[in-house]
Amino acid sequence: MLKRLWMIFGPVLIAGLLVFLLIFFYPTEMHHNLGAEKRSAVATTIDSFKERSQKVRALSDPNVRFVPFFGSSECLRFDGAHPAVLAEKYNRSYRPYLLGQGGAASLNQYFGMQQMLPQLENKQVVYVISPQWFSKNGYDPAAFQQYFNGDQLTSFLKHQSGDQASQYAATRLLQQFPNVAMKDLVQKLASKEELSTADNEMIELLARFNERQASFFGQFSVRGYVNYDKHVAKYLKILPDQFSYQAIEDVVKADAEKNTSNNEMGMENYFYNEQIKKDLKKLKDSQKSFTYLKSPEYNDLQLVLTQFSKSKVNPIFIIPPVNKKWMDYAGLREDMYQQTVQKIRYQLESQGFTNIADFSKDGGEPFFMKDTIHLGWLGWLAFDKAVDPFLSNPTPAPTYHLNERFFSKDWATYDGDVKEFQ
């Protein structure tokens, strides 16, 4: 009987063991390929966002300076003035590596950073903060889980230091992913219990396996590579060969005029037809009760700021506007929006994060927005005028002065004068 079972299952067990050993001992050294790295940088797929190997390979390339552009769905709005297009066309000293997906916000970005801490050390980054992230209930758990994986988990556990940031991150992880793997260890961190030697040895073992698994399977990941042609290459042909903001503006403005012809809100035709037109009447005043002043996202943002401080990262923060015509139609209160922006800015500036490009009042400018909340055309051009000088003239990170009160529920729910917050 045992012999018969072995004849059936033995080859499967041996094959499984061989695969495990292959992955466990697979080398993590990376061979750089500029063409592949450029394609992964603008792929904007879920894989390029949450998996380790592609982004680490690009960000560690000694010959090309890829810069992380953290955000959410705005990364996916391409046109002739998109930063990835301009950097390629005019052969700038850097190339954006786009790290964003619809529904992603600071918590996903924090866990994704754990996979590439050496590549962030002493570097510059671009971080887009959308006030829309700061909803009352914060993240949709399904969206968070979609962009989270085991490699992020073991990277976090491996690098955590038992401080307040680690405790908060563990607590939020349990809220967003109650059945997360290694839940007992995450619960220990959330409870401020010290991990045992055995715990740390297991974390180290699994982290090593996950890192090598990412290296092994990452070499086969080509999904999204074709996006380079439609995201970047097709726009290179329409831009002037000699760099000139005025000449670029003329080109993208003509494109915007052509592609916003079917509505009065200055939105891209396709977006308006697909997302707005059929529900236009129902959307009238649909956002009158929205508020972004009370949200766990403020605490999640503090996680990112803490990581930037630890890694001596020098970021520039971008705060986008809402399409003004859409804001008025949907009833979104501008005073609330500006109060949200002031709260975000206070959290940044009071801790030493002073590189901020605030476009929150520019949503009424022609061709500034692609749709309701995303930059496009002249909005991207304004973005570039702020970001390019920052990245083209690198400076070290300043000295930050972190305030752990920004992890508190008091701050997350505070809607008063920020200068009076204690």
Labelled PLM ranges:
Residues 71-72, 128-132, 270-279, 318-323, ...:
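Short loop/turn segments at strand-loop or loop-helix junctions that form parts
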Residues 4-26:
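Hydrophobic membrane-insertion alpha-helices, especially the h-region
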Residues 99-101, 336, 342-422:
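C-terminal regions of proteins
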